[in-house]
Amino acid sequence: MAGPFSRLLSARPGLKLLALAGAGSLAAGILLRPESVRAATGERRRLYPPSAEYPDLRKHNNCMASHLTPAVYARLCDKTTPTGWTLDQCIQTGVDNPGHPFIKTVGMVAGDEETYEVFAELFDPVIQERHNGYDPRTMKHTTDLDASKIRSGYFDERYVLSSRVRTGRSIRGLSLPPACTRAERREVERVVVDALSGLKGDLAGRYYRLSEMTEAEQQQLIDDHFLFDKPVSPLLTAAGMARDWPDARGIWHNNEKSFLIWVNEEDHTRVISMEKGGNMKRVFERFCRGLKKVEKLIQERGWEFMWNERLGYILTCPSNLGTGLRAGVHVKLPLLSKDSRFPKILENLRLQKRGTGGVDTPATADVFDISNLDRLGKSEVELVQLVIDGVNYLIDCERRLEKGQDIRIPPPLVHGKH
C-alpha cells in the first residue's frame, strides 16, 4: 500500500520538488521546511499590476482586512501553492463578506496544507490576532487527549441542558474543501468511511450519504442538532465550499447518536461527541477515545491527518487551527444574559456566546450556546477545563442574581506561553 507521502506526490505533481525535503518530515507531521515549500511554489502572470487588483476593504471588519496592506498584497498576489491555490482565493470570502459590526470574523480560508506556509506573511498575523496573541513564528502547539486529567465536569442540569465537544481533522495529501475537486472530495469520503467501518463497541455505527436522504430526513437531523445545515451561509458559498452539493457529503454516527462524524462540510471531517445533560467529563472521555481510534484506523490505511508543531491540526479556517476544538453547552441564563456585564464576563473567561441554534441564531427561552473562544496555543484538556470552570462561574452568577446578590467581573485569563 502506498504511504501518505507517495500518495501526496502522486496526487499533486507539483509537490515532487518537495521530495528533496525527505518523506520522513511529512510522515512525522513536521512542518515542511519553508525553503522546500518555496521551491514548489508557483508564480502566475497578471495582466494588471497588484495596485489595480487590490480589493476595497475600507468598510470591512474582519481579521484579513486588518492585516492585508497593498504592500503585502503585492508581494503575495502572484504566488501559488503547489496545487495552484492563490491569495485571491484565500481572501475572497472576506472580501465578499465585510463582517458584522460587532463580531470580527476571520475573513480568509486555506485551500490546502501549504497555504499556511506560502501565504504566511498574511496568515501569521491573522492567526496571532484571532488566537489571543499566539505567534506561530515562535510558539509551538500542544496536543493532550488524556481525559483523566479533567477536574469536576458535572454541571447542574437545572441550567445545563446538553454538552458537546467537537473538532475537525483533514486528510493529508488532499486539498481542503474550498479547493478540492470532485474526485478529491469523493476520495476523502472513501478514506473516512472505510476507516469508520472499523469502529467497535459503543462507537460502532453507520454512514448516511446526504444524496441518499430525503429532504425530511435531512431536516430532522438538522433540527435535532446532529447534522450540519444546508450550505446557505455566504461564508461557505463565497469560499467555494458549497460546490457540487450534496455530492460526497454525509454523516456517520454511532447507534446512540452520541459520537458523530460529519464528512466534507467546512472541513474534511468534524468529529463530535454529544449528549443531553451536564456530564461534560463523560462527553470528553468519549471524544478522546473515539478520536484516537479514528486516527489509528486512518493511519492503518496508509493515510494521516494534517498536523505540524506550530499550528497543530490544519483546518480550512484559521480560527480552527490547533486543537480545532469547541467544547460547548446549552445553558439557561435568563438573568445573567440580561446583565450589562455579561459580555465582559465572557470575554475575560475566554468564552464565546452563540444563539441556541448556533452562529447567527437567536437565543430561545434564554438558552445560549457557550463555548471556548480559543483553539490554538492551549491543549484539548486545557480548553475543556476552561469551559468547565467558566460555565460553572456563569451558573454561580445566575444563582447569585436569583438571590438578589451582586456579581463581579473576573480578571482576564492570561494566554500561556508555549
From Swiss-Prot:
The modification Phosphoserine is found at residues 152, 197, 233. In many tissues, with highest levels in brain gut and kidney. In the kidney localized primarily in the outer medulla in the thick ascending limb and distal convoluted tubule. ATP binds at residues 162-166, 225, 270, 326, 354-359, 369. Its main location: mitochondrion. Signal peptide: none annotated. Keywords: ATP-binding, Kinase, Membrane, Mitochondrion, Mitochondrion inner membrane, Nucleotide-binding, Phosphoprotein, Transferase, Transit peptide. It catalyses: creatine + ATP = N-phosphocreatine + ADP + H(+). InterPro entries: ATP-guanido_PTrfase (IPR000749), ATP-guanido_PTrfase_AS (IPR022415), ATP-guanido_PTrfase_cat (IPR022414), ATP-guanido_PTrfase_N (IPR022413), ATP-guanido_PTrfase_N_sf (IPR036802), Gln_synth/guanido_kin_cat_dom (IPR014746). Residues 46-132 form the Phosphagen kinase N-terminal domain. The modification Phosphothreonine is found at residues 214, 356. Belongs to the ATP:guanido phosphotransferase family. Exists as an octamer composed of four MTCK homodimers. This is Creatine kinase U-type, mitochondrial. It comes from Rattus norvegicus. The lineage of its organism: Eukaryota, Metazoa, Chordata, Craniata, Vertebrata.
